[in-house]
Amino acid sequence: MPKRSVVSLEKASVASSDKALVVSSDQAPVLSPDKALISEATPAWLKLKELTGARIALGRTGVSLPTKDILEFRMAHARARDAVHTALEIEPLFKALVGKGFAPVTVTSQAIDRHTFLLRPDLGRRLSVASAQTLTTLSHDTSGPLPSLAFVIADGLSAQAIQGHALQLLEALRVELPQVQEAAVVIATQARVALGDEIGEILGAELVVVLIGERPGLSAPDSMSAYLTWHPKVGRTDVERNCISNIRLEGLGYAESAQKLAWLIRQAKVLGKSGVDLKEESES
């Protein structure tokens, strides 16, 4: 190739590079933190946000969430973990129930500790040998007819929910259904829903209601559920239960929950069944 051709190519290359690097100031992108990187929720989203504790309308900073929302998410996650691992404070709950005229009994499942309870759900569904014997003795020693209704106050996956809502719901339910005062009340630890079946069977209860702490969510670490089962016995399945969930101040309030539960209890006795055969149609 002739020398002059090489020089011409080099000049053309340099000229092309210089042209590519030259950008006028009025063409350069402007990255303003106040305008380009930060975005807040619109008024419409903010109005929806007032109606729920769910994480909506968080806004953004660049491609991420604002620092405030990230920290709140981590705090919610920590609260949920604490709710799962925190033990139920039995003594204050026991005394509070006695103070309201109930006669509670305490039992535990076959899960010997929280670690076992979380890893072995099956053990949380059966009573320990000692607890089964305690209830058997109690059912034999009781003078007069056995209670037709039994309440099991179970820690489940959120002792915090039980600590905060169980007694309040029972008080509200007593207004709707005065015979609640005569019901058997059992406090159960390391307990799953199905533990109520064995408890109800041993006590000879017609109906068992299990008040249990729900699995914590990131916006609700203290949510409680009420499970109702007609003629409880070991082996009952979820299809034979009725459930009222999200019982808490920010969810379904005590009065409304009590109205629904009282309706279900009455209808279960009328129909002689619970679960999918009993549809909740109360007007509350």
Model-predicted regions and their roles:
Residues 80-95, 100-103, 165, 172-185, ...:
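Alpha/propeptide regions of enzymes that mature by internal proteolysis
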Residues 107-108, 152-154, 209-215, 229:
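Short beta-strand segments
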Residues 107, 188, 244:
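Hydrophobic residues at beta-strand termini and immediately following loops
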Residues 112-114, 159, 217, 235:
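Short, acidic Gly/Pro/Ser/Thr-rich loop/turn segments
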Residues 2, 34-130:
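Active-site loop/lid in soluble adenylation, ligation, and acyl-transfer enzymes
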